[in-house]
């Protein structure tokens, strides 16, 4: 498996969902992969909202604090979830924006405002 930080972006081969799957794999959890539509079709109809429950995630309540390993769905310049990342215990997220290297960023105001769903895998319930 490639290192989680510093990956080149490539649709399906090395994108945000691939990074999330590899993060969980490093924790001993295998998440499903889906046949993703061509990139331009995904931009018009992202599949994240259709898939998170099938992958074993549940949505956190508003009063539940984030914990390391929680998944975050983002609406990045869109009204639909088109990006996913992982919350890390130091207040950062691990994610992979299109045409950029995978990285950790502060889970600051802009990313918090862009968050559409806060998810926890059923295997990581407290």
Segments from the language model and where they lie:
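Short, Lys/Arg-rich amphipathic alpha-helical interaction segments
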Residues: 102-126
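...with weaker cross-activation on analogous glycine-rich loops/strands in unrelated enzymes
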Residues: 37-101, 107
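Short acidic/glycine-rich loop or secondary-structure boundary segments that cap or lie
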Residues: 29-33, 42-43
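Surface-exposed patches in mature extracellular/periplasmic domains of secreted proteins
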Residues: 11-13, 31-36
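Active-site nucleophilic cysteine motif
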Residues: 8-27
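Detector for glycine-centered tight turns/loop "hinges" at secondary-structure junctions
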Residues: 28-29, 91
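Active-site-adjacent structural segments surrounding the nucleophilic cysteine of cysteine proteases
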Residues: 1-7
């Amino acid at each position: 498996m490639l290192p989680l930080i510093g990956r080149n972006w490539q649709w399906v081969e090395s994108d945000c969902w691939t990074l999330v799957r590899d993060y969980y794999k490093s924790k001993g959890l295998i998440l499903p992969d889906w046949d993703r539509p061509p990139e331009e079709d995904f931009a018009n109809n992202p599949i994240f909202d259709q898939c998170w429950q099938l992958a074993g995630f549940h949505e956190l309540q508003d009063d539940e604090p984030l914990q390391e390993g929680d998944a975050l769905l983002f609406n990045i310049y869109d009204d639909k979830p088109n990006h996913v990342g992982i919350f890390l215990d130091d207040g950062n997220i691990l994610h992979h924006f299109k045409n950029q290297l995978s990285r950790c960023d502060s889970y600051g105001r802009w990313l918090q405002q862009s968050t559409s769903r806060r998810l926890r895998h059923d295997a990581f319930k407290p």
